[in-house]
């Protein structure tokens, strides 16, 4: 059963799933699609052409789907946001819609946890089970792989790609691509080690050991792309293949830290 506060504004054409709760002074725009068991809390705003998956929570004064902060954007362009299931979007977070430079949509996968005051700009592509801590700021066209964590107060430059299972430390500033399963920190951020906490949660000890050896082979010395090419030969681990292909395909470069690594 839907529960909609009398002061909430629901525009014509909005599609609301079963058991949706919309609290006081919330706004839901036209052509939105709100899944089952979604809660939109007091004062939150869901703008036109936004899709939010089942069992999600949008907290007070978050704004999802407003127009891009891009001076080339024209209002007549098709533009929206697509968010998967089980998302948590905390207070004052902002998620902008996409532009014609992408496919018109900013996209976020399932199980996202987006903390207070985070900003996700136009055309970002975020995978499943990502976490953005308070005040993390993603510029346009940033891509995050599944299971990636971005620490609080960390800005990420436009077009940066962060691979699966990464950890970006809090109060860092990132302007280059980060290889899957790695931890980066600093201003400017560079790769310091494997994200051991993250990979131990997901993989068995044998795979963790293989990834640790691969990290040392890739990053300790020599040319990074040559190391990746050599490591790919007869490689059986799919996760190590992901690391190597990412290195070979990067467009913004990989920030390599040549000091003491912990993996």
UniProtKB/Swiss-Prot annotation:
GO terms for biological process: lipid A biosynthetic process. The keyword Acyltransferase applies. It is found in: Cytoplasm. It comes from Campylobacter jejuni subsp. doylei (strain ATCC BAA-1458 / RM4099 / 269.97). Belongs to the transferase hexapeptide repeat family. LpxA subfamily. Homotrimer. This is Acyl-[acyl-carrier-protein]--UDP-N-acetylglucosamine O-acyltransferase. One of its GO terms (cellular component) is membrane.
């Amino acid at each position: 059963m839907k529960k909609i506060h009398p002061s909430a504004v629901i525009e014509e054409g909005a599609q609301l799933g079963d058991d949706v709760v919309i609290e006081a002074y919330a706004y839901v725009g036209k052509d939105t699609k709100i899944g089952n068991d979604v809660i939109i809390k007091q004062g939150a705003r869901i703008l036109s052409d936004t899709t939010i998956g089942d069992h999600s929570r949008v907290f007070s004064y978050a704004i999802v789907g407003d127009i891009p902060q891009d001076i080339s954007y024209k209002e007549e362009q098709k533009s929206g946001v697509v968010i998967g299931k089980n998302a948590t979007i905390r207070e004052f977070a902002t998620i902008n819609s996409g532009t014609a430079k992408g496919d018109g949509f900013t996209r976020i996968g399932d199980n996202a946890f987006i903390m207070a005051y985070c900003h996700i700009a136009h055309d970002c592509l975020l995978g499943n089970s990502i976490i953005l801590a308070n005040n993390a700021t993603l510029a346009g066209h940033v891509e995050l792989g599944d299971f990636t964590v971005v620490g609080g107060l960390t800005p990420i430059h436009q077009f940066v790609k962060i691979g699966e299972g990464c950890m970006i430390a809090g109060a860092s500033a990132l302007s280059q691509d980060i290889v899957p399963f790695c931890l980066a920190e600093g201003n400017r951020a560079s790769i310091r080690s494997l994200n051991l906490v993250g990979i131990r949660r997901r993989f068995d000890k044998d795979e963790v050991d293989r990834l640790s050896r691969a990290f040392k082979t890739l990053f300790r010395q020599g040319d990074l792309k040559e190391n990746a090419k050599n490591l790919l030969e007869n490689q059986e681990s799919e996760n190590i293949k992901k690391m190597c292909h990412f290195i070979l395909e990067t467009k913004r470069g990989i920030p390599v830290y040549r000091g003491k690594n912990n993996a």
